[in-house]
């Protein structure tokens, strides 16, 4: 069936700020769908509050609304844009839940908007636990024994029947939020109460425990003609009990027999048909009892999911794009496979390699949180690696996570290692180390329930490590031997660690033996047809499938796995660089290891290498492709850390040079440079040892801001107010950070106002692109503070001085590209805190606020264009206020106090735009899911809040200063840091923990009071800007 012509305008809902359980994969999915629908001639309207995404760029959708994802705001967009259809399956759980609300409250019916991609009934059957169980019973597919309960009393009755351990799954929540596995009756009561509260429909499913069973996922697509294809099978390395988003996963499934696979396949076909998903993709999860082969279905997601992104990258099959086209009427056999150009999308992908995904965690950001993994997702990012065997794929994935293969585990006692065999982020490394020590596969399997096949594969890697020492001197290894060793996935660094040589010597010996990798192509068909899409991975075999072209080419290094401090903002910058360089006539080569992102889409760069971002893997590609330039300044700290070694090995780094990066990041040379330029700085010193740190602290006086050099996201940064606090801090840092880092000690400017300044420089001219005023005072990490552009409270004279000083600094450093400078203003003086000669996390926000693609400009500067040629010679002065607010993941980390400090903790951001700064702030707060009340009670705790109280009272809120019994207020402002902050957060009450935040919150509520807030697209804002200028 050809595409529908009765639809003209299609509304797509994004997923909002990046959060745990809902990350960059939805930017990738949404971007793919937007491009596909636009190409088909549809008018596309997007609502998404997250400015750090590619999908919210003004040239993707026809109308882009950076507005809160709430029924009220989406209704306003629908009223204004009058879409014919709503496609809700590309924005994760947020979009699906919102679409269901708009359907239930009559908005869709009122404006004649059709749900496409999945109908309301299919969403209900797939998402509602009771409806799903009933549907499975009807088709004879077994589910875990369980019951949906709607009250604690009902739960207690059913628990008596089913016993412990028991699994609690709230309905309609994201990433397992509010759920868990209860091993004790006390835990059962606590988790069930929380789950009933967290579920938007106040119901939870109680299920028998299937801990230790094997877990599989099938990625399935179905069209209107009832053609169903299985895109891939995915097997969880970790057994049941760990959320699939936190599990190491492998595609295709490795331990299923053909009969078992066909059984899961048949079940999947029956399930997708019964649920009624007939225009898109679904992810179906199964558990298999290894004792008797009993199969039960765990759940399905009737939408594009995190696993869909992984399956797309693993196979080369663009699930989100195909799902969007099926939603507008196409059938699978009508859609061509982009990669082969001869097979239709109805052909199931076949792969002749193994893909491994390893999650990335951030428990170090939340000290005191237990790191046990369960049914609630806790990982903040992930890596993917491709190899010809599981062993090669696993070792490549491990080095992609940027964690040492052995590291601290070699120093641990065997008893301590055994203590790490429960589900936790360090279990894989503990398993490897125990197998090294002869623990044996049966003992490790008994303790972990990890399938013996996986453990025996790891045992083979460990045996090979020992064998390396019996192969004779490494200086005499011949090509064949090198190839056999490298085919197991060993890096040069790991080989060097085993044989006792530096990595560079191992590399030189390997190259002398002519043992270099070949590159294979991801083609969806196991090389049966020619592939036209250049998507590659390395291995050590004979045939190389990748022939470099003669065109001038530039390599762009991606940012690797998302983590707190290095998120989707850096992917945004690298993708913009790709587009800018393609426009300038260069062939672009992307190297990255993150399966969630737009940068690793096969049709973003001219060539994609899905490889670890390590010195060895990057240099192999550079030597293979011979580019004219390598760009390291856009992917965050990961590529920056490689810059110096790459340059020394002959990689042609373009843009800002490694020497400049070093000068800005090395505190002593940076301090000297600022002194030379006469830029005020807080008094500071650099200590090389703990003893020296204590001596310098006594000299500088307290309070001090302390941190190790070369970190991103304020890792291990703290404010210390006494010698005791400093000593505790030093003990922790030297235990946690590799090597012996130098420690920076800076006088802490208590109560100072911070500024973030993004600047472009071509070496001859520097232009400030935007100055952001932080809402929170100094002491809160810049990545966790809300900020407003342009500044609201500072004098024009001071801002002019900051602008001039920033531009002088950029020229003095010799920056060629982007520079981010942070300032602190106290008593009318602007002190420079730090300068980062790279893309910062504010680049997407500033680009959208000032209507200039800064990362594109940086890429053009890197290949020799000047700011004059680009047409960016003056600081833009937008006639609007833009506010960036952050999303904090405290709810996922039980018991952690939700107080902001110098270590970054946020995972994502939202943006609000208005002509009034406080209304922009109000929109940004709603966009970040902080629902500021316009009526009700505000509880204020702490000194210095009289002005806040007066503002809130004038806005009509009742202000109290003591809690009334157990009753929680509608808004909590608590600058004392009391435990009530955590309680309020868990109950969904908006919380504010800083005085500055309290002032902005009160003014925002007052500004919004009695106003009808309209909606305006980003394109309309930018046209308004263009007209004004």
Swiss-Prot record:
Annotated positions binding Mn(2+) 2: 299, 301
Region annotation Carboxyphosphate synthetic domain: where it falls in the sequence: 1-402
Key word Nucleotide-binding present: yes
Subunit structure: Composed of two chains; the small (or glutamine) chain promotes the hydrolysis of glutamine to ammonia, which is used by the large (or ammonia) chain to synthesize carbamoyl phosphate. Tetramer of heterodimers (alpha,beta)4.
Binding site for Mg(2+) 4: 834, 836
Classification of source organism: Bacteria, Thermotogati, Deinococcota, Deinococci, Deinococcales
Gene Ontology CC entries for this record: cytoplasm
Provenance organism: Deinococcus geothermalis (strain DSM 11300 / CIP 105573 / AG-3a)
Protein name as catalogued: Carbamoyl phosphate synthase large chain
Gene3D superfamilies linked to this entry: 3.40.50.20, ATP-grasp fold, B domain, Carbamoyl-phosphate synthetase, large subunit oligomerisation domain
Cofactor(s) demanded: Mg(2+); Mn(2+)
Residues binding Mn(2+) 3: 822, 834
Binding site for Mg(2+) 3: 822, 834
Gene: carB
PANTHER family: CARBAMOYL-PHOSPHATE SYNTHASE [AMMONIA], MITOCHONDRIAL, CARBAMOYLTRANSFERASE FAMILY MEMBER
Binding site for ATP 2: 707, 747, 749, 754, 779-782, 822, 834
Catalyzed chemical reaction(s): hydrogencarbonate + L-glutamine + 2 ATP + H2O = carbamoyl phosphate + L-glutamate + 2 ADP + phosphate + 2 H(+)
């Amino acid at each position: 069936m050809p595409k529908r012509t009765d639809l003209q305008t299609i509304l797509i809902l994004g997923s909002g700020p990046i959060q745990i359980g809902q990350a960059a994969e939805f930017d990738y999915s949404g971007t793919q769908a937007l491009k596909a629908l636009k190409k088909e001639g549809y008018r596309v309207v997007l609502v998404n509050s997250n400015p750090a995404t590619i999908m919210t760029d003004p040239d993707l959708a026809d109308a882009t609304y950076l507005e809160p994802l709430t029924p009220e705001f989406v209704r306003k967009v629908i009223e204004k844009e009058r879409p014919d259809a709503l496609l809700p399956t590309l924005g994760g759980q947020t979009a699906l839940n919102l679409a269901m609300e708009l359907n239930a409250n009559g908005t869709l019916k009122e404006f004649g908007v059709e749900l496409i991609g999945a109908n309301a009934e299919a969403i209900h059957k797939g998402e509602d636990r009771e409806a799903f169980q009933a549907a499975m019973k009807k088709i004879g597919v077994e589910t875990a024994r369980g019951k949906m309960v709607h009250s604690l009393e009902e739960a207690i009755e059913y628990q008596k029947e089913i016993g412990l351990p028991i699994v609690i799954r709230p309905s309609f929540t994201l990433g397992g939020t509010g759920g868990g596995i209860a091993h004790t009756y006390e835990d059962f009561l606590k988790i069930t109460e929380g789950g009933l509260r967290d579920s938007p429909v106040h119901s939870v499913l109680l299920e028998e425990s299937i801990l230790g069973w094997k877990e599989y996922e099938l990625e399935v697509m179905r069209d209107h003609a009832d053609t169903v294809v299985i895109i891939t099978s995915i097997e969880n390395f970790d057994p049941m009990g760990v959320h699939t988003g936190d599990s190491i996963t492998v595609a295709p499934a490795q331990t299923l027999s053909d009969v078992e696979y066909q059984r899961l396949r048949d079940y999947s076909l029956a399930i997708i048909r019964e649920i009624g998903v007939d225009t898109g993709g679904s992810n179906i999860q199964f558990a298999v009892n290894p004792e008797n082969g009993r199969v039960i279905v765990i759940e399905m997601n009737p939408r594009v999911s995190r696993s869909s992104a992984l399956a797309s990258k693993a196979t080369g099959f663009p699930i989100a794009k195909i799902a969007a086209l099926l939603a507008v009427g196409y059938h699978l056999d009508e859609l061509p496979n982009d990669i082969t150009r001869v097979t239709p999308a109805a052909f199931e992908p076949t792969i002749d390699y193994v893909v491994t995904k390893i999650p990335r965690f951030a428990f170090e950001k939340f000290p005191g949180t237990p790191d046990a993994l369960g049914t609630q997702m806790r990982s903040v990012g992930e890596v993917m690696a491709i190899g010809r065997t599981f062993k090669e794929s696993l070792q490549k994935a491990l080095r992609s996570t940027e964690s040492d293969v052995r590291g601290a585990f070699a120093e641990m006692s065997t008893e301590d290692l055994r203590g790490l065999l429960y589900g936790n982020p360090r279990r894989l490394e503990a398993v490897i180390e125990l197998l090294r020590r002869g623990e044996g596969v049966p003992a490790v399997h008994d303790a972990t329930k990890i399938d013996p096949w996986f453990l025996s594969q790891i045992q083979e890697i460990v045996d090979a490590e020992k064998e390396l020492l019996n192969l004779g001197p490494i200086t005499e290894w011949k090509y064949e031997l090198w190839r056999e060793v490298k085919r197991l996935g060993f890096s040069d660094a790991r080989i060097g660690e085993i044989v006792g040589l530096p990595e560079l010597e191992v590399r030189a010996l390997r190259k002398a033996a002519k043992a270099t990798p070949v590159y294979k192509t991801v083609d969806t068909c196991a090389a049966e047809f020619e592939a036209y899409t250049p998507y590659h991975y390395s291995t050590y075999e004979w045939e190389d499938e990748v022939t470099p072209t003669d065109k001038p080419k530039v390599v762009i290094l991606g940012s690797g796995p998302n983590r707190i401090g290095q998120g989707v903002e850096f992917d945004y910058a690298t993708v913009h660089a790709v587009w800018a360089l393609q426009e300038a006539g260069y062939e672009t080569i992307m190297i990255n290891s993150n399966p969630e992102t737009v940068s690793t889409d096969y049709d973003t760069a001219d060539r994609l290498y899905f490889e670890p971002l390590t010195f060895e893997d990057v240099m192999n590609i550079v030597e293979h492709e011979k580019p004219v330039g390598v760009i390291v300044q856009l992917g965050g700290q990961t590529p920056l850390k490689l810059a110096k070694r790459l340059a020394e090995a002959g990689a042609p780094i373009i843009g800002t040079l490694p020497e400049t990066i070093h000068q800005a990041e090395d505190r002593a040379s940076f301090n000297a440079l600022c002194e030379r330029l006469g830029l005020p700085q807080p008094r500071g010193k650099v200590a090389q040892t703990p003893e020296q740190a204590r001596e310098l602290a006594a000299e500088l006086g307290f309070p001090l801001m302390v941190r190790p050099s070369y970190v991103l996201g304020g890792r291990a940064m703290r404010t210390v107010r006494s010698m005791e606090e400093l000593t505790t801090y030093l003990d922790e840092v030297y235990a946690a950070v590799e090597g012996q880092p130098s420690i920076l000690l800076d006088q802490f400017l208590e109560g100072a106002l911070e500024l973030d300044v993004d600047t472009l420089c071509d070496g001859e001219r520097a232009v400030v692109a935007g100055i952001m005023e932080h809402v929170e005072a100094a002491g809160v990490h810049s990545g966790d503070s809300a900020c407003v552009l342009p500044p609201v409270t500072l004098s024009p004279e001071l801002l002019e001085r900051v602008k001039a000083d920033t531009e002088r600094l950029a020229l003095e450093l010799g920056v060629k590209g982007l520079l981010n400078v942070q300032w602190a203003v106290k008593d009318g003086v602007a002190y420079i805190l730090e300068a980062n000669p790279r893309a910062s996390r504010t680049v997407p926000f500033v680009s959208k606020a000032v209507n200039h693609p800064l990362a594109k400009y940086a890429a053009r500067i890197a290949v020799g264009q000047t700011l004059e040629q680009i047409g960016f010679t003056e600081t833009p002065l937008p006639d609007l206020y833009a506010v960036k607010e952050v999303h904090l993941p405290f709810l996922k980390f039980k018991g952690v106090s939700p107080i902001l400090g110098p270590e970054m903790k946020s995972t994502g951001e939202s943006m609000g735009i208005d002509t009034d700064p406080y209304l922009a702030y109000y929109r940004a707060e709603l966009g970040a899911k902080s629902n500021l009340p316009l009526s009700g009670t505000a509880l204020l705790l702490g000194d210095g809040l009289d002005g806040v109280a007066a503002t809130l009272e004038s806005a009509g809120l009742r202000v109290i200063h003591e809690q009334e019994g157990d009753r929680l207020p509608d808004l909590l402002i608590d600058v004392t840091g009391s435990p009530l902050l955590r309680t309020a957060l868990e109950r969904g009450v908006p919380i504010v923990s800083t005085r500055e935040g309290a002032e902005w919150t009160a003014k925002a509520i007052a500004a919004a009071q009695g106003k009808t807030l309209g909606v305006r697209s980003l394109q309309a804002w930018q046209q308004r800007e263009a007209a004004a200028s």
